């Protein structure tokens, strides 16, 4: 019987086989040795009806820790933030939902304007001159920034702070290996980049120095001091930054950063089990023609009306092929739109207030932990994350907390041996006083 959604008949199969010059399916796979071919039936359950399937999938999904029912103190690069309701409404519109950055851009003015607004807001937040249409995520944005630096300076050494997100450093290592670049980690001291070590490592072979602001431990790096060291040898200064924090902190561009990158996830993008998210990439005019990804520019048409185009396309793969600045194409256009809508809905004052609440609530949580007898490991200023010495395995604590509908902080021992039994606690604007107090009390009872 012919399936309504699988219309291929035996005649169709026969015609296709004849077209490619074989008689049977077995002959088609004749180059695969008999000894490794699968014989028999796949152990697949019988097909379910749509209602049965929906019920089973719902039961499976119910096992997840839903952030509507759990209080999350887990950050480490992915955060539980408020997303205005309008975000889902806009990105669900059909003209955006299946968006593809066009090669004939004039036909998609709405899509191009949305990307242009994203670029503009990223520039305003970071204090930079130009931003691209988005990257895959913060990790790949960081690696692409390092590749830009290596290509521009023609130097082979990359210095990266050990206080940069471990997963971003891993992505950097992958990119660097293919380009025969050397990656050197700079130790951290008291939760921030060790400036003495950095000073000793920066020389005329260094393409760039990469730091995170706020860094992986939540601490605010001293960008002014780092910039002086970096630019002494004409290396590039790359800063990875949580864009929400820039609603309260001085933008990296004000400290002389050459490239600012990061992940726009805090703006309107759910945690989504770690992705997909949306990287951003901003730089100065000096590197405008070396920036990866797509750039949308504003112009006027023959009637003098405002319009948008994909500009500086000679950098891109559909023109330069293997000599392109990157192979990024449509990438995260939909998530970039979500970030744009969220930032627009919040407005400048809303972003500042959201950042202020992160700082205020994180400071309250820190004081509560200290009052309960916990040691907060680093004393420096921080944004919305800080490190707590738990004196026992973090996994054991989190296993207990999850039973109380609390998602505990990140286990730093996974990435830093010296910080075994230390928890990275994230406190966003969504956390209430009651939730913070419950977390501290539950952890105090486990001690």
UniProtKB/Swiss-Prot annotation:
An annotated Gene Ontology molecular function:
glycine dehydrogenase (decarboxylating) activity
Q: Membrane-spanning regions, if any?
A: none
Which example biological process does GO assign this protein? nucleoside metabolic process
Domain of life of the source: Bacteria
Q: Which InterPro entries match?
A: GcvPA, GDC-P_N, GDC_P, PyrdxlP-dep_Trfase, PyrdxlP-dep_Trfase_major, PyrdxlP-dep_Trfase_small
Report the EC number(s), separated by commas if there are several: 1.4.4.2
Record SUPFAM superfamilies: PLP-dependent transferases (SSF53383)
Which Pfam family would be a valid example here? GDC-P
Q: Which UniProt keywords apply?
A: Oxidoreductase
| HAMAP family recorded | GcvPA
The entry assigns this protein to a family as follows: Belongs to the GcvP family. N-terminal subunit subfamily.
How is the quaternary structure described? The glycine cleavage system is composed of four proteins: P, T, L and H. In this organism, the P 'protein' is a heterodimer of two subunits.
Sum up the protein's function in the record's words.
The glycine cleavage system catalyzes the degradation of glycine. The P protein binds the alpha-amino group of glycine through its pyridoxal phosphate cofactor; CO(2) is released and the remaining methylamine moiety is then transferred to the lipoamide cofactor of the H protein.
What is this protein called in UniProt?
A: Probable glycine dehydrogenase (decarboxylating) subunit 1
